[in-house]
Every structure is written in structure tokens, then in C-alpha cells.
Swiss-Prot record:
Top-level EC class as recorded in UniProt: lyase
Protein name listed in UniProt: S-adenosyl-L-methionine-dependent tRNA 4-demethylwyosine synthase
Organism classification: Eukaryota, Viridiplantae, Streptophyta, Embryophyta, Tracheophyta
Family: Belongs to the TYW1 family.
Catalysed conversion reaction: N(1)-methylguanosine(37) in tRNA(Phe) + pyruvate + S-adenosyl-L-methionine = 4-demethylwyosine(37) in tRNA(Phe) + 5'-deoxyadenosine + L-methionine + CO2 + H2O
Domain Radical SAM core: start-end pairs: 316-559
Keyword check for 4Fe-4S: yes
Length: 647
């Protein structure tokens, strides 16, 4: 009995061993056969229509996919462009040729339209029941679009696609191509990769293209193109001229047509590439040198015409028609969800570009600003007196776009402005505490406080720094060290941060700002990079209610001082410093400030305060509108809404 059992076990073992050996031999021969085909694929690929998948959040990958499709068509190679969102991954084993153009979104994750496909590949590759030959009939290539600013997650999706496809038996025709949206070389990198793909598809050797991935993305800059600002909403006509990075990628000239190379000086390249310069110029910016910009604000135009000033006029007494809006750094360290520049200017964690001199920037900004003011001559409401005043700027809002405090010579630039008796309002995004500490006295220093908790700050600001929260808190602490006027700027986004009342109040004690500006987010139109809608825009009554609640929380330390209803903005002031005998002193004595700076002696924020006029005080019937100006309301000629008809 035992002998029979032993024989059966041996026979079963031999059968298993034979089957395993046969499987291994079959798999080896199959893979060897497919590998040989991959080196000369023309005989097998011509009969099959390939697919180009674009995995895209904002349209960059889609635009590149369209370029690749046109290139293939010009070479008589048939492809279909496919949005993976509408594709059934279970059909992938039927494909014989696929090309992926894949971008990487926040946290190294795929954009929404490619989530299901990427996840399906990942799950299949990890599922032992699927096997490693599922895609053995499929040849593929991958090009990734990402930003080195995000470190290890750079082109993570493209690399994962390649790994998963190989793990399922797919044959990679050429190495993964990697393009960086920041370095100005995306078009060249993509074209090199495309050339490699076409070469293989037309029967060339895959080995000829092995160097492609090494050539792509050699620059190590720490930036990304996107757009941001802290200032007032822009004229409606500016939106039509915006060029998104996706459009740039789609319309950029090919390598054969001659790509404009990025200018380098002493090994450092210019922050603003020719393509980005063209984009920002279409948005109304005047570019100064290689990294600065100036733009005329809608409120500057408004007060030139006598139609009212911005909230700074109501809160601090600036003359809006004499205010220049500029920045010495178009780069930033955040990608805020409420950013309305449609993500077309750089971001970075440190300064790595060619640097222009402060005097050159200030002179260039003033010259360009004055030229824009001159264009207002003859516009209805613009008097010769107002025009002449506008040609002599007295204020500078260093908050146009980007992070001005990143500019290494920011103190020297401030000196240039103060030397011309131009006041300075600088806004920082609270990611560079060491820069705040080293700042010389300026008229008013802002820190953007876009959220009150670590989780919501990450969701709203989308910062590049991994230690963004620590930097944020340290920036608030640094603010407390400053002797001049300091401000927290809160941007309320309904449904995102309006419920964090207690958390906001806890931040007050860290920086102890002189003022707290609370402003409702401005809706800037739909964008693939932003999920905000009009539902996220608070009413002025919402902003007032939030401000009053914060004031109550402070137990009298802060009170609501001013409002500017048109901008949906409210100001809290520190009562012990700026409320004297029941009257608010939020305005600034600008001449006194410049005298104090020129003296070289230490001074504080109360040394140059001035009384707030009654029309700007919170609760006044004017709502912060200067009665010396003429209120103008646009006529809305929208067709009337259809009335319900009762049967």
C-alpha cells in the first residue's frame, strides 16, 4: 500500500516538474520571439492601428498627444488618440501598439482622466492570477510630463506606466521619455522622444534611441510655470488673451523648425523663457529684464477716471491712481487653487536664475508703468491733473504675481523705491521665514494666511516645500519681530476654509499682526487646475459675519475697523495701537514714513499712522467708497429670465 502511494507521489512530482519545465521553455521562447520582433517591428505593426493615450490634468499631455498624432500621420502611421477616461482597460490585452503621454499630478498621482487605467494596470501587475504575459502582444512607449520642483514624484506616473506594462509582458520600444515643464526644453525633449518612436515604427533599431531618456530634462531647475497673484480682480478683457501652458505645449515649434533656446548667463538661465514671456505679455504684463514684471491695475484706471479707488485707498489712504503694481520675482513657491493666472509663470523653492540689478528693475518698472498711464490720456473722466499725478507714482504694491521676497536683492530694491519716496506694500506667501527676518523696514508687510490648519493649507496653497507648515508658522513668528506695520491677509474660500474660525484665532497670537485683511476669493473663471466655482465665492455679508466672529473671539484685542464692499474686503485692527479715543488710525502718513526711513533711526508702526476718514470706517453708509469719487455701475443688458407660466 505504501509502495503504491510512493509511486503516485513520484509520478505527480514528475508531471509537475515536466509541466513547469515546459511552461518556462515556452515563456522563454515566446519572450525571445517578441523581443526579436521589437527590434524590427515594421512587419507586425503596419497591420494594426495603434492608440495614443493622453493622461492629462490641464491639457499639456493632450496637446502633446495631438502633436504626436500629426507627426505619425505625416509618416503614414495610423493612430487613434484616446482619452483613457472613456477607455475600457480590459481591452488593453487586445492592443498591439500603444503610446502614452502622461502627466503627473499632485503627490505623484495620475490626473483624474487616467486614474482608472493606471490603477487597473497596477492591480493587474500585482495579481498573480493575471500572469506576466497578459500584454505580451503589445508594444508600447511612454513620455512623461512633470516638474522637478516636486522631487521624487517627478514623472512618477510615466515611470509607473512603464514598469506596470513591462510587468505584464509589454515590450517597451524605447526608454521612458521625461519632459520638465519648467526648463524651457519640453518641446525639444518631446521631439527627441517622438523621433525615436517614429524611427522604431519605421523599422529602425530600438537601440539607436537608448540615449533619448538621458538627453531629456537635463536641467535641474527648481521651478514650474503657473500663475498667481494677490491683487484685485483684473479687467474682463484680459482673460481672452491668456495662453495656458497646455496651449504652449501644443503650439510650440518643433525641433525641425528651430526651437528658441533658453538664454543662459554665467551658467544660469533666465527665469522667463521666450514662450512664457509671450504668454504673460498677452495677459497684459510688461516684462522687465529676465524675471520681473509690471502691470496696470484696474483700480489705477478707475481712480484715474474718478470712479473710486481700491481697498487700500479705503483702509490705508493710498492714491490708487498713483500706485504701481510690480514684482521682482515672477516665480512663487505655491500653486494656490484660487490663483487666476492659469498656471503660466514659474514656481521654485530657491533662486537659481540670472539676476537683474535692483536699480534696473525699478527704473524699468517706472518707465513701463508711466507708458501705460499715458495710454489713459483722452479716456472719459481722466483729467490732465489726474493724469499728471498718475505719471508720478507714490506707492508700489510688490504683490503683482509670484513671491517678491525670493529676489536676493529685495532690500536693495526697497531702498531704490524709498529713495524715490515711493511707499512699499509687500506680500509674501509665508514660505520663507528667514527672508522675512532679514527684511529692512517697509511701509507695510503682509503674510498670506490662506488656511488655518496644516491639511487645509496644503489643499489650498499646494506648496512645494515638504515642511510647508513649519515654514508657515515660522513666517508668522518672524512677523512679530518686525516693528513696522504688519498684516495677515486671509482669503476666504467658501467650503474650504470658512469653518476654521477657532484655528484662525489661534494663529493671531503667533504673529500678533497690526491688521488682518479678510477678503472673499475672486472667481476667475473655470480652469482645469482649479476646482473652484461661484459656489466657493462668499458674499460680502459672509465676509462681514466671519470678521465679526473673529473680533468677538479676540475679546477686544481686534475689532472690525474698515470695509470696502466692492472688493468684498474687511479690515480688523489692533485696538491697543490703532484705536485712539474711539477713533481709528488705520491710514498712513506717507511723508512721515519716508522721513523716518531717511533718518536711519528705529521707529514703529504707530509713528506714521493717520486717522481714518469716517466714510472708510466699518458700518459707514458709504461702505468704504470715497464720496469724493463718482460711483459708476455698469449697465447689465442681459435678457430677462423667462417667467414661469401657470397652466
Amino acid at each position: 500500500m505504501s509502495t503504491t502511494s510512493s509511486v503516485r507521489v513520484r509520478l505527480a512530482f514528475v508531471a509537475l516538474l515536466s509541466a513547469t519545465t515546459f511552461y518556462c521553455i515556452h515563456k522563454y521562447r515566446r519572450l525571445k520571439h517578441l523581443k526579436n520582433l521589437s527590434l524590427n517591428p515594421s512587419s507586425t505593426l503596419k497591420a494594426s492601428r495603434g492608440k495614443i493615450f493622453f493622461i492629462s490634468q490641464t491639457g499639456t499631455a493632450k496637446a502633446l498627444a495631438q502633436r504626436l498624432h500629426e507627426l505619425c500621420a505625416s509618416n503614414d502611421i495610423a493612430f487613434d488618440i484616446v482619452d483613457p477616461h472613456s477607455y475600457e482597460p480590459e481591452d488593453l490585452p487586445k492592443e498591439t501598439l500603444v503610446l502614452f503621454i502622461a502627466s503627473t499630478w499632485d503627490g505623484g498621482k495620475p490626473p483624474k482622466n487616467g486614474e482608472f487605467l493606471v490603477n487597473w494596470l497596477g492591480e493587474s501587475a500585482e495579481d498573480f492570477r493575471v500572469g506576466s504575459l497578459l500584454l505580451s502582444d503589445c508594444k508600447f512607449a511612454v513620455f512623461g510630463v512633470g516638474s522637478r520642483a516636486y522631487g521624487e514624484s517627478y514623472n512618477a506616473v510615466a515611470k509607473e506606466l512603464s514598469s506596470r506594462m513591462i510587468g505584464l509582458g509589454g515590450l517597451e520600444m524605447i526608454p521612458v521619455g521625461e519632459g520638465d515643464v519648467d526648463d524651457g526644453e519640453l518641446d525639444r525633449a518631446f521631439q527627441d522622444w517622438c523621433d525615436g518612436v517614429i524611427r522604431v515604427l519605421k523599422g529602425g533599431s530600438a537601440q539607436e534611441t537608448n540615449g533619448v531618456s538621458q538627453q531629456i530634462g537635463a536641467v535641474e531647475d527648481d521651478l514650474e510655470y503657473y500663475d498667481s497673484t494677490d491683487e484685485e480682480d483684473e479687467d474682463n478683457d484680459a482673460d481672452g488673451g491668456i495662453v495656458d501652458l497646455e496651449d504652449i505645449a501644443g503650439k510650440a515649434p518643433s525641433k525641425r523648425n528651430g526651437v528658441v533656446k533658453v538664454t543662459k548667463v554665467d551658467g544660469k538661465k533666465e527665469m522667463v523663457t521666450p514662450v512664457i514671456r509671450a504668454s504673460l505679455t498677452k495677459q497684459g504684463y510688461k516684462i522687465i529684464g529676465s524675471h520681473s514684471g509690471v502691470k496696470i491695475c484696474r483700480w489705477t484706471k478707475s481712480q484715474l477716471r474718478g470712479r473710486g479707488g481700491c481697498y487700500k485707498h479705503s483702509f490705508y489712504g493710498i492714491e490708487s491712481h498713483r500706485c504701481m503694481e510690480t514684482t521682482p520675482s515672477l516665480a512663487c513657491a505655491n500653486k494656490c487653487v484660487f490663483c487666476w493666472r492659469h498656471h503660466t509663470n514659474p514656481v521654485g523653492k530657491s533662486w537659481q536664475w540670472k539676476m537683474d540689478e535692483p536699480s534696473v528693475i525699478v527704473k524699468g518698472a517706472l518707465d513701463l508703468h508711466k507708458n501705460m498711464i499715458k495710454q489713459m490720456k483722452g479716456v472719459p473722466g481722466v483729467t490732465p491733473e489726474k493724469l499728471q499725478e498718475g505719471l508720478n507714482p507714490r506707492h508700489c504694491a510688490l504683490s503683482l504675481v509670484g513671491e517678491p521676497i525670493m529676489y536676493p536683492e529685495i532690500n536693495a530694491l526697497v531702498d531704490e523705491l524709498h529713495g524715490r519716496r515711493i511707499s512699499t506694500f509687500l506680500v509674501t506667501n509665508a514660505q520663507f521665514p528667514e527672508k522675512i527676518l532679514m527684511m529692512k523696514p517697509i511701509t507695510q508687510l503682509y503674510v498670506s494666511v490662506d488656511a488655518a490648519t496644516k491639511e487645509s493649507l496644503k489643499a489650498i496653497d499646494r506648496p512645494l516645500f515638504a515642511d510647508f507648515w513649519e515654514r508657515f508658522i515660522d513666517s508668522l513668528k518672524a512677523l512679530q519681530e518686525k516693528q513696522q506695520r504688519t498684516v495677515y491677509r486671509l482669503t476666504l474660500v467658501k467650503g474650504w476654509n470658512t469653518e476654521e474660525l477657532d484655528a484662525y484665532f489661534n494663529l493671531f497670537s503667533i504673529g500678533k499682526p497690526d491688521f488682518i485683511e479678510i477678503k472673499g476669493v475672486t472667481y476667475c473663471g473655470s480652469s482645469a487646475t482649479s476646482k473652484l466655482t461661484m459656489e466657493n465665492v462668499p458674499w460680502h455679508t459672509d465676509v462681514k459675519a466671519f470678521s465679526e466672529a473673529l473680533s468677538l473671539k479676540s475679546n477686544g484685542e481686534y475689532e472690525v475697523a474698515c470695509e470696502h464692499a466692492h472688493s468684498c474686503c474687511v479690515l480688523l485692527g489692533r485696538t491697543e495701537k490703532f484705536k485712539v479715543d474711539g477713533k481709528w488710525f488705520t491710514w498712513i502718513d506717507y511723508e512721515k514714513f519716508h522721513d523716518l526711513v531717511a533718518s536711519g533711526e528705529p521707529f514703529t508702526s504707530t509713528d506714521y499712522m493717520a486717522q481714518t476718514p469716517s466714510w472708510a470706517v466699518y458700518g459707514a453708509q458709504e461702505g468704504g467708497f470715497d464720496p469724493g469719487q463718482l460711483r459708476y455701475k455698469k449697465e447689465r443688458n442681459h435678457p430677462p429670465k423667462p417667467q414661469a407660466v401657470l397652466a
